[in-house]
Amino acid sequence: MKIIQAAVEFAPFIKAGGLGDAVYSLSKALSASHDVEVLLPFYPCIFPTVSSQVIDEKVFAYEFLGRQHASSISYSYEGMILTVITLDSQLELFSTSTIYTQDDTLRFSAFSAAAAAYIQKLNHVDIVHMHDWHTGLLPGLLKEPNRQHYPKRIFTIHNFSYRGYCSTQLLGASGISEFGLSNYQLFRDPQVSVLLKGALYCSDYITTVSPTYAQDILHDYSDYEMHDAIMARRHVFRGILNGIDDNIWNPETDSSLVANYGKNLLDSPEILFTKKEENKVALYEKLGMSPEHSPLLCIISRIVEQKGPEFMKAAILHAMENGYAFILVGKCYDEETQRKFSNLQESLTMSPNVRIILDYNEPLARLLYGAADMLCIPSHFEPCGLTQLIGMRYGTVPLARATGGLADTVTPGINGFTFSHADNFNDFFRMLSQAVTTYRHEPDVWFQLVEEGMLRSSGLSTMAMHYLEIYNSLL
């Protein structure tokens, strides 16, 4: 089967969050038995050099704000084909210092137009699988009746809150037919279109990244036209839980850890916890923290409204009042949040047990997974979440809000702790206190939580199997 995966992130080359990891993991898993090609836009200022073998190069035209020119380079990469598309005559659109900017609907619609033209040049494609609103124009362009090839189209919603509202005139610049364009337009204001809305109507099948989040989407009434769209397509909509790549997230081989360990040490828990303690000591030394504070609770997250920044601050207060260690590693994405957390960071510089690092540093994050006893994910909503899966793999017990994919993967008393209420801190503090008390006074129970998490399947092969079931059902 020839499968195209189209996205604007792909780890490790271009990544801002879990999207890049998810696209890589799925593509890698599918490539074990199928012909998988990943399409990415070229970001001149931030795309790293690809050292893999070049297997093909193309030059082609596409339509977006007139006739444009693009080129592609295809690399052989880990059993897949990685194709990077450069918008040669609109290169300025992607000449930015970050993946996401203020004109993303323009940039990514141009990429979708180029990707559609590229796909039409291929001899045969069975499936085109598109990820998130950024590629929302692509299913509409591939469904055009005048297209020579008509591959089956799968669309995955990674975050329903981001939809790609834009002007209808902008999408019309791609040459899409009036009928195709109507799938994107809002009835209440035809001058406004939504990339995600059109993708829902123009795809053969729609998925999201966990079963519970699929139900959350079906009950989302924030925009009644988006609700109508997903309800109209609910018969071809399901949630498939994301997985992680065990080869990438593996405490046995992770070079960022001072002491490696793995599931093989579950028969010798004292050795396992000694290894984690060695990582903790190294981390404390690195950050200038006092070693006597335990347990260690960490948060590794983007600091945005979705992720519950008010709960992050509350966790700091709880740690200071209860004498355990807390480390936050995360990046702010707006000036106001940056200002607030920078002030908090400065005020805690001399704290013996709390540290805030306002940047995402992967080696540090990996060491934190290996050192921490607990990982907190206090999200208001979470489509799937990968940090809790990584944490469990590293023997770090997740403390999470029971929402979306977190509710599907973290079970209280089995592999972690949860809280439900997002409108007050009482339930959150109850969860934190229960976790700290269990760690300090019930070591056998704590080990069972660690063991259950480390033995949990990564879910990657199951995820790939479910997607293959969908692909095959459409062919």
Curated annotation (Swiss-Prot):
It catalyses: [(1->4)-alpha-D-glucosyl](n) + ADP-alpha-D-glucose = [(1->4)-alpha-D-glucosyl](n+1) + ADP + H(+). GO terms for molecular function: alpha-1,4-glucan glucosyltransferase (ADP-glucose donor) activity; alpha-1,4-glucan glucosyltransferase (UDP-glucose donor) activity. Its EC number is 2.4.1.21. The keyword Transferase applies. Keywords: Glycogen biosynthesis, Glycosyltransferase, Transferase. InterPro entries: Glyco_trans_1 (IPR001296), GS/SS (IPR011835), Starch_synth_cat_dom (IPR013534). Pathway: Glycan biosynthesis; glycogen biosynthesis. It is an enzyme of class 2 (transferase). One of its GO terms (biological process) is glycogen biosynthetic process. SUPFAM superfamilies: UDP-Glycosyltransferase/glycogen phosphorylase (SSF53756). It comes from the Bacteria. The keyword Transferase applies. ADP-alpha-D-glucose binds at residue 15. Synthesizes alpha-1,4-glucan chains using ADP-glucose. PANTHER family: GLYCOGEN SYNTHASE 2-RELATED, PTHR46083. Belongs to the glycosyltransferase 1 family. Bacterial/plant glycogen synthase subfamily. This is Glycogen synthase. It comes from Chlamydia felis (strain Fe/C-56).
